[in-house]
Amino acid sequence: MRMIKPGEEVIFTVPIRKVKKIVPRWKRAPRAVKFVREFIARHAKAQEVIISTKVNEKIWERGIEKPPSKLRVKVRVEEEEREGGKVRIAYVDLA
C-alpha cells in the first residue's frame, strides 16, 4: 500500500473481531480502542494517533463486553514540525 500523503483522507475498516477472540470479555472495549490506535499507526505510518470522541463512543456504545466487530474510520494525516524533526499525526474520525 502506498504511503498516505499529508492532508489526504483515507477510509479504513478496522477488524476489531481479532481482539474479541483473544481478550477477556471485561477488557474488550478498552483493548479495542488500543487496537484501533495500533492499527492506524501501522497503516498510516504515524507516530501519534488522535482518536475522536465519536469513535470512542461508537466502540463503547454497547458496553465494555460487546464492542463492534468492525469499524469504518476516516483517517487524515498531518505532518508537524517538532523539536526532534517532523512528526506524522493521524486524526481518526467515523466514516
UniProtKB/Swiss-Prot annotation:
The lineage of its organism: Archaea, Methanobacteriati, Methanobacteriota, Thermococci, Thermococcales. HAMAP family: Ribosomal_eL31. GO terms for cellular component: cytosolic large ribosomal subunit. This is Large ribosomal subunit protein eL31. GO terms for biological process: cytoplasmic translation. Pfam families: Ribosomal_L31e. Keywords: Ribonucleoprotein, Ribosomal protein. InterPro entries: Ribosomal_eL31, Ribosomal_eL31_CS, Ribosomal_eL31_dom_sf. The keyword Cell cycle does not apply. SUPFAM superfamilies: Ribosomal protein L31e (SSF54575). GO terms for molecular function: structural constituent of ribosome. Belongs to the eukaryotic ribosomal protein eL31 family.
